[in-house]
Amino acid sequence: MYLQTDRLILRPFEAGDLTRFSHINADPEVMRFFPAPQTSEETAQMLARWADKQTRYGYAFAAVETRHDKQLIGMAGLSRLEDGVPIAPCSEIGWRLTPSAWHKGYATEAARAWLAYGFDTLGLSEIFSYTPRLNLASQRVMQRIGMQHAQALDFEYPALPEGHELRPMVVYRLPSQTYVART
């Protein structure tokens, strides 16, 4: 699956992306709202899971590359959330970019393209996103792309211990009817 926006190319991850994406995932600043930075091996395993989801469902998180210089700046996309959190099963949208790509509108631009693909091409009925309550930047992206906070669905991330600062999660959602009415 390849999508293009004014400034971005959204494409499946390739073998040559592992080193760069591993570097992004190992950055403590990037992973501030995740339990821990990831090793190269963990990143490789994650990419394999995403490739499997792409095969099974026809969509998965994908590479984000800038059009002007073809640099990999992170990931964004849709993924089938199968289990592990109370809102599963559902389709989720997410993003993770290197710090040099922050505050440029790239996450919003990529997410809007993925919403259009999810609703217009895949025919999804609803798309969810979740993030730690502390991650205000991701919540702002969710709001910019038209998602609404579904407070009744907020949850405590089960894989983190009680009292962990990243355990409280906020859930945003966008039903297809709302998306269609806005476009």
Task: List each language-model region with its residue ranges.
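Acyl-donor (CoA/ACP) binding surface of acyl/acetyltransferases
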Residues: 1-32, 65-183
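Conserved GNAT-fold acetyl-CoA-binding loop/helix
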Residues: 29-50, 60-62
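Short loop/turn motifs at secondary-structure junctions and domain boundaries
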Residues: 53-57
